[in-house]
Design a protein with these regions (language model features):
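Rhodanese-like catalytic fold shared by cysteine-dependent sulfurtransferases
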Residues: 1-27, 34-67, 76-114
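Short, surface-exposed ligand- or partner-binding patches at beta-edge/loop junctions that are enriched
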Residues: 71
């Protein structure tokens, strides 16, 4: 089994919640903009806006072999970033389907919707 088979391109918000509760080591990468992050965020998420990815990709290089779950508002930007990271050799990267909006609806209603 290759890494992409082991790590499907998408993961549900429920599965991400289970990862967090199991203390599984992974990075939750928030690719929204700072203003969005200030409005609503998942505790422990690391902000790296999609608009800055090209210039800041080197910050992720030490994590190239780590499990990274990418999230945004609804899942569109995070899917683009997931695909971009996979295209440059990050093999354990997944998109959180539905983004923080689905997180608010299905996992943690205390996270504001916007």
């Amino acid at each position: 089994m290759n890494a992409n088979e082991e790590f499907p391109i998408e993961v549900s918000v429920e599965d991400v919640d289970a990862l967090r509760k199991s203390d599984t080591d992974f990075i939750l990468l928030d690719v929204r903009e700072q203003q969005e992050y200030d409005t609503a965020r998942i505790e422990g998420a690391r902000l790296l806006p999609m608009s800055e990815l090209r210039n800041r990709l080197g910050e992720l290089e030490p994590n190239k072999d780590d499990h990274i779950v990418v999230q945004c508002h609804h899942g569109g930007r995070s899917m683009q970033v997931t695909q971009a990271l996979r295209s440059v050799g990050f093999t354990r990267v997944q998109n959180m389907a539905g983004g923080i909006d689905q997180w608010s609806l299905k996992v943690d209603p205390s996270v504001p919707r916007y």
